[in-house]
Amino acid sequence: MKKLILVLLLAYSMLEALAQNIPAKSTVVEQLRSANDYFMKKWPDPVKTIITNKERPANIWTRGVYYEGLMAFYKIDNQKRYYDYSVEWGEKHHWKPVRGEVYTRHADNQNCGMTYIDLYRIDPKPERLAAIKANIDAVINSGRYNDWTWIDAIQMAMPIFVKLGVTLNDTKYFDYMYKMYSHIKYQEGGHGLFNPKDNLWWRDKDFIPPYAEPNGEDCYWARGNGWVLAALALVLQELPKTDAHYMEYLDDFQKLAKALLPLQRTDGFWNVSLHDPNHFGGKETSGTALFVYGMTWGINNGHLSKTDFLPAVEKGWNAISKESLQPNGFLGYVQSTGKEPKDGQPVTVDKVPDFEDYGLGCFLLAGTEIYKLAKK
């Protein structure tokens, strides 16, 4: 009995020592404010169009991901300016999907609806919910469930279904969400985009073998797998545990998280190519932030072992908050938009990605969960 007590005390001491590497809550908030203030100062008008190789509206998916992060941050740093910035963004886009296309089926163009729903929950004005509800209702009424053909789509649209189901107390959204998830997992590209051998996801059917990385391994893109991990966390935190597919989502979440653990670099980042560290290997913020978000949420909610995952999230957060985050609030090492490891290269600390918003959204999501993990 004395030996058992000693072992338990030692284990507890080890956890306490590890926990000390998580920064204080106040430090996390300062880091998140720094990054967010940099962006809000650069983009004071939330509906100013985004110009890169062409002009795009300000509620495309990249900006939608930013607002996902901002809404999460708002819950721990309750500044009215965050809320006002978000409401103005929604209002001036008339609470509609991208380009006002109420009946778009493209997940990227639906993503902004996630924040519209969050803002409706704060102030339930009907116009905040009407268009995104009409959009998803049309998807359901069509009977088609093969829209998600790339894994990014899981994050872009899947949480909208669960949020609508919870908000409206209507399980039809949960049921159709599973049909769409089941298609991409088991059927898309022939046998689905999830590889049960490695518990990782191919980005789309173009990357299913015989496609391979230069070292002969399967191509698993970090940010793509990060989208899946984040989406599953977002779904699990809202979906009733009584749902018929809750345990499958949880199992997929846990398997993916465990598969990622041994792939983390010693510096805390993950490479853009998860199974070929020499194929554009190096520090990358967005995928790392999504993994930190998912894993930390898993720890905070008892779905992942603190003993196993705390060292990974501690290393990951310290990497992106100390190396990626610059003194002026700029986030370095963000891979530009694309669909595979070679896109947006080179990834460096001072390179401005084609869009600065989605990387920040991922960072805010991760930091919000780290804040909850921190003791004081």
Q: Model-derived features: where do they sit?
A:
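Asp-box/WD-like beta-propeller blade repeats and closely related beta-sheet repeat scaffolds
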Residues: 128-161
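Bacterial Sec-dependent N-terminal signal peptides
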Residues: 1-23
